[in-house]
Amino acid sequence: MQVLSSLKTAKTRHPDCKIVSRRGRLYVICKSNPRFKAVQGKKKRR
C-alpha cells in the first residue's frame, strides 16, 4: 500500500478503484487489482 499526499491520480488508475474514508484516513481500494491500493492522511494522536 502506498502512502500518498494526493489521491487525485490514484483514483483514476483503474476503473474499479474507489475512495473510502475509514478512521480519519482516505483509502483507495481496488478489488480487481490490489496493487493500486493507497492511503492518505496520518492517524491523529491523542
Curated annotation (Swiss-Prot):
Q: Which SUPFAM superfamilies match?
A: Ribosomal protein L36
| A molecular function (GO) term | structural constituent of ribosome
What InterPro entries would the database entry show? Ribosomal_bL36, Ribosomal_bL36_sp, Ribosomal_L36_bact
Gene Ontology biological process terms in this record? translation
Cite a GO CC annotation: ribosome
Keyword annotations of the record = Ribonucleoprotein, Ribosomal protein
Read off the PANTHER family from this record: 50S RIBOSOMAL PROTEIN L36 2, LARGE RIBOSOMAL SUBUNIT PROTEIN BL36B
Identify the NCBIfam families for this entry: PRK00831.1 (NF002021), rpmJ_bact (TIGR01022)
Name this protein carries in UniProt: Large ribosomal subunit protein bL36
Q: What is the lineage of its organism?
A: Bacteria, Pseudomonadati, Pseudomonadota, Gammaproteobacteria, Enterobacterales
Gene designation: rpmJ
